[in-house]
Amino acid sequence: MSIVTQPRGASRPITREPLVRAVAALILTDLVGGLLAVSADVNTWGEAWGSQALLAAPLPMIGVQILLAVLAVRLRGRKAAIPAVLLSLACLVSVISGFFDGGLGNDELTTALSAYQTFLPAVTAVVGVLAARQARRSSRGQ
């Protein structure tokens, strides 16, 4: 029987990175949120992932989050810290904007949809924290 080990300092597969898993959960949360908004008639298909979205982030923000997460885990050393910091800041902006865009507590939302509306920024905040952690690790060259 042989045991295969990775050399010290070797990176683990990208899909096992906590940041990647959290971003995948965020994408799923945005997808489900948009579908819930359309099925509940609180958003149209065109609004569900746009600037009028009540239960999902707009598509441009989702795209930026995906791109920055990929760069944060693909790049090495200090170069990876830049997209990780930007992702953390994007998540912060996303969470804060959720409180001021007029959608929070919208009268058209049921209690369950309002609960989902608070779940989305929570998932976004987790991604932001993990991105900040990734930035810190990357800036130290780990």
Task: Give residue spans per PLM region.
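Hydrophobic transmembrane helix segments
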Residues: 21-63, 90
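Loop-to-transmembrane helix junctions at the membrane interface
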Residues: 66-93, 99
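Alpha-helical transmembrane segments
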Residues: 18-29, 56, 79-89, 112-122
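Interfacial non-cytosolic loop connecting adjacent transmembrane helices
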Residues: 40-56, 94-118
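Juxtamembrane loop-transmembrane helix junctions in multi-pass integral membrane proteins
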Residues: 10-18, 45-52, 71-82, 104-111
